[in-house]
Amino acid sequence: MSGFLIANALLFLIVTAYAVYLFVYLVKTRLAYIKLGQKEQFDQRFKERLHAIWVNVFGQKKLLKDKKSGIIHVMFFYGFILVQFGAIDFIIKGLAPGRNLSLGPVYPAFTFFQEIVTFLILIAVGWAFYRRYIEKLVRLKRGFKAGLVLIFIGGLMLTVLLGNGMNLIWHEHGLSWSEPIASGIAFMLSGVGKTGAAVIFYIAWWIHLLFLLSFLVYVPQSKHAHLIAGPANVFFNRMESAGKLEKIDFTDETKESYGAGKIEDFRQSQLLDLYACVECGRCTNMCPATGTGKMLSPMDLILRLRDHLTEKGAAVTSRSPWVPAAAFRHTRGNQLAAASAGSGSQEAAAALDYNPSLIGDVITEEEIWACTTCRNCEDQCPVMNEHVDKIIDLRRYLVLTEGKMDSDAQRAMTSIERQGNPWGLNRKERENWRDEAPDAEIPTVKEMKKEGKEFEYLFWVGSMGSYDNRSQKIAISFAKLLNHAGVSFAILGNKEKNSGDTPRRLGNEFLFQELAEKNISEFEKNDVKKIVTIDPHAYNLFKNEYPDFGFEGEVYHHTEVLAELVKNGKLRPQHPLHETITFHDSCYLGRYNEVYDPPREILKAIPGVQLVEMERSRETGMCCGAGGGLMWMEEETGNRINVARTEQALAVNPSVISSGCPYCLTMLGDGTKAKEAEDQVKTYDVVELLAQSVLGADLKMGEKQ
């Protein structure tokens, strides 16, 4: 037996060492691929980053947003960590028969706990198999590769239970309460005898070891690389406000292009995202573009970028992405690596001719322009991948480097550049909306200065509030409520320009920066300390992105100011409305800035209002379809996003659909018309409803919206 044990131990060391070598090689290879990206500075905010690890890795916070899948993953995650101690115990039993993990009197409790955890993991494997292959959850991939990890995990659990059962027979330990499942197996197979039990034990032991080491090697070259890249991605995730876009330095004369025209143009942290992807499909499941039949799928976008990085990385670094190399010699990645190293077959040399373009071959322009930048994908991602900034970088390349843009979007850009608004209307008519409210005091900054008066808030009206007839009513209602509450404010009037959100989200960073600098100059010239706006897109820009260009000041959304005025009694809702209202969360107010409660607090304060929530609300609220500059583009593929969102609102039988965004309100109003429901269901901004309750203002509930 001693000779066998020596041979067994030597073989164990050789196989384990080879597996560890392959694992390290694969991790270093992926790291080399990631390093092809653009370097970036690390802010060293370790405390916050460790907190993110605690919450999202160990706390599984994002995974538990989907309770069913989340619970399965929690069982896998903690179960797999815990059973590693059992695996060590099992390996010791094979290397030194009769020995085990030295835990003294607590060993029986340890083995009992291990068996319970092992059993729960087997249940989780069965549940996961059911969800993927029988229930056929749409967002989950099927096929052999998708189920291979279930085979690995299930095999590991079954072999350790079988091996422990045989160990009881082999060493005549007898049945034990501390190993109930192994004891059951031992009881059923008691007829095999000691020798037979020893043989079966080592068969199970080696299968277990090979499963374990194969899984170790499989992880870095599969979607399960997220076990390594996921926690790293959470740790290195940007600590800035959600969805904040990187500033382009146009003064850098070394730059030959802007945006991402090739995979190496992405930042290293963006490339880390690609290997962190779990392929869970949660992003795609929530994407408004995917849900309405567009080509864009956030998960597929990440996976195609990942595969492209792997192949490009193999060609550049000469490091084969797949091991054992002999088994994967026919894959493009290994052929590219071999050809790059000057070795390999004719097929490997021919592989060098494969040079797909990032935009066109890997990701299509149609996909790039389908994104509404709503960030529902990012909010759902358990490893904190950022999809939107990659799409914006691709847009930046198309717009700034190649001069490509959708014709409708280009018209809006030209109009903004020439007249400061997307319609190309006269910039000198920007403040004319005040004429629609002769009973309200809506002074310009210039007028306030002329009278020697000061103002607390700069009311940023925005292009919609200034020029769009429907949105002007929102601006007027807000101004009247500020007058009623005694809040001093002023507008820039004709000095106001477009905030720059549309150009920036469409990829025209140059125009955005030009607008931002001019707006900030106007703020500074007029000593602006506080800004309030009815436009969530401008709100997000001023609050989170203008500071990169030198702006310092407080920024508020109008619902935040109104909620506070209601709370402190300066605005008293008194006229009942008797309406059933559902509230639509603007993406740039909600997911980007986590402003969910103020608009709801306002609606709840209005007498007679019954607030009902849509199935998708707050963090999971669906986009109206206007974000990302798509307000100015036609949807030519699939169903209209605004109609899909309107259908979700109509499903809860409201009499009013409310929002806190003029863009959303326009899209939802068009949606009710498309569903021929505009006579039964009206669309109003929160401020209009509050104005009716506080001032008794007649909103003409039956008028055409």
From Swiss-Prot:
Membrane-spanning intervals of the chain: 4-24, 71-91, 109-129, 146-166, 173-193, 199-219
Repeat among keywords: yes
Enzyme Commission number(s) from the entry: 1.-.-.-
Gene3D superfamilies: Alpha-helical ferredoxin, Transmembrane di-heme cytochromes, Chain C
GO CC field: plasma membrane
UniProt name for this protein: Probable iron-sulfur-binding oxidoreductase FadF
Cofactor: how bound: Binds 2 [4Fe-4S] clusters.
Cofactor: [4Fe-4S] cluster
Keywords annotated in UniProt: 4Fe-4S, Cell membrane, Iron, Iron-sulfur, Membrane, Metal-binding, Oxidoreductase, Repeat, Transmembrane, Transmembrane helix
InterPro entries cross-referenced by the UniProt entry: 4Fe4S_Fe-S-bd, 4Fe4S_Fe_S_CS, Cys_rich_dom, HdrC_iron-sulfur_subunit, Helical_ferredxn, NarG-like_sf
Binding annotation for [4Fe-4S] cluster 2: 287, 371, 374, 377
The encoding gene: fadF
GO terms of molecular function: 4 iron, 4 sulfur cluster binding; metal ion binding; oxidoreductase activity
Stretches assigned to the 4Fe-4S ferredoxin-type domain: 268-298, 360-391
Primary localization class, coarse: membrane
Keyword field contains Lipoprotein: no
Induction notes from the record: Repressed by FadR in the absence of LCFAs (fatty acids of 14-20 carbon atoms). When LCFAs are present in the medium, they are converted to long-chain acyl-CoAs, which antagonize FadR as to its binding to FadR boxes on target DNA and thus derepress transcription.
Subcellular location, record wording: Cell membrane
Major enzyme class: oxidoreductase
Lipid bilayer topology: Multi-pass membrane protein
Binding site for [4Fe-4S] cluster 1: 277, 280, 283, 381
